[in-house]
């Protein structure tokens, strides 16, 4: 499939984070929200915990789930890097023009820069895709609970906007799906990628309320739609898909219902919502991604329905053989959402 050019999209993930060398990102200090480079003490993140001691002028990140228990990172950086070209090709370009128009007409924007909050930024692929497609000076605030991912996102961030204007970044450590309008004070835009489907209905509602309260638009891309097409079709496709979708809904998470819930939540807060499909279209040139996706997709289905194990093992072997032979094509459906919240002072 055709890949649009993305700034630094092919940046390699370092084996270990090195010294921070990013414009606009201050070095870690004792009690800060980033552990010092090379440090393992305190490197694990407690979900729901904000920075131990924010630097002057910084707001603490807001809690997502105050479980009091330590969880492993949600995504491996290698997986995030592997999927980045497919994500870049899939995101909807049709939502960019209405977004640009809204950003140009934000109250106080004339001649000013953009402040973009990227929620659950991972390795920063959203910024690498979007920043070079927007004009004007930009300051990106990257939120994630994993300090390693935050470091990589910062050092691999784009340095210039579409018109050559400067792009700077800062990082905020924490699991931040629940935001408040105060946490978004001064924000021009909130972005997220592949986030909505791992949130609950309450968390999506809180995100919509925060964006509406701050009067900033939200571009939320690549939420799973619950539909997969494989060529050639197989009798087990439907059962695997249904079991995977049920797995996605575990623990009250929205999974494939996320976009509908988010659209309803933003609409209730007076936002204009636009949806566009953003499917992955995977062919022989995407064999590495297809293989990893297949293993995870079938594995989750079997975890949800163990009685599928024997048939699913044969199914996976057959699909992997077709993938290795360059004969498998997959469409994984996603949806992008643009919510144009009303500016807080009643502007355009």
Regions found by a protein language model. Give the residues of each.
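Class I SAM-dependent methyltransferase SAM/SAH-binding core
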Residues: 117, 124-178
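A short, conserved alpha-helix within the catalytic core of class I
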Residues: 198-211
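Conserved Class I S-adenosyl-L-methionine
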Residues: 184, 267, 272-348
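Short conserved loop adjoining the S-adenosyl-L-methionine
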Residues: 178-184
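A conserved beta-strand element that flanks and buttresses the S-adenosyl-L-methionine
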Residues: 191
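Short catalytic micro-motifs in class I SAM-dependent methyltransferases
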Residues: 194-195
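Conserved catalytic/acceptor-binding region of the Class I
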Residues: 216-278
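Class I SAM-dependent methyltransferase Rossmann-like catalytic core
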Residues: 2-19, 36-38, 42-108
């Amino acid at each position: 499939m055709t890949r649009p050019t993305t700034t630094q999209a092919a940046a390699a993930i370092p084996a270990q984070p090195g010294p921070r060398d990013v414009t606009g990102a201050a070095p870690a200090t004792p009690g800060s929200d980033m552990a010092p480079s090379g440090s393992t003490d305190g490197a694990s993140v407690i979900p729901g915990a904000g920075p131990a001691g924010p630097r002057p002028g910084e707001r603490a990140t807001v809690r997502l789930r105050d479980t009091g228990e330590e969880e492993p990172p949600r995504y491996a950086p290698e997986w995030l890097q592997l999927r980045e070209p497919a994500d870049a090709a899939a995101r909807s370009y049709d939502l960019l023009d209405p977004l640009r128009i809204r950003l140009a007409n934000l109250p106080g924007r004339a001649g000013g820069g953009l402040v973009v909050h990227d929620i659950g930024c991972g390795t920063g692929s959203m910024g690498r895709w979007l920043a070079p497609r927007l004009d004007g000076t930009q300051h990106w605030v990257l939120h994630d609970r994993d300090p390693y991912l935050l470091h990589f996102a910062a050092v691999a961030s784009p340095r210039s906007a579409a018109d050559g204007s400067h792009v700077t970044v800062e990082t905020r450590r924490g699991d931040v799906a629940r935001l408040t309008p105060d946490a978004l004070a001064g924000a021009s835009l909130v972005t997220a990628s592949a986030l909505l489907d791992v949130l609950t209905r309450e968390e999506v509602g809180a995100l919509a309320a925060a964006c509406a309260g701050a009067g900033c638009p939200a571009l939320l891309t690549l939420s799973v739609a619950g539909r997969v097409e494989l060529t050639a079709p197989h009798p087990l496709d439907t059962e695997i898909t249904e079991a995977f979708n049920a797995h996605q809904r575990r623990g009250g998470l929205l999974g494939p219902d996320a976009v509908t819930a988010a659209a309803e939540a933003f609409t209730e807060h007076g936002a204009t919502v636009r949806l566009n499909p953003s499917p992955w279209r995977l062919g022989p040139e995407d064999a590495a991604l297809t293989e990893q996706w297949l293993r995870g997709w079938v594995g989750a289905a079997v975890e949800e329905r163990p009685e599928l194990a024997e048939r699913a093992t044969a199914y996976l072997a057959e699909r992997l053989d077709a993938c290795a032979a360059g004969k498998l094509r997959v469409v994984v459906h996603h949806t992008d959402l643009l919510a144009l919240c009303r500016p807080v002072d009643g502007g355009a």
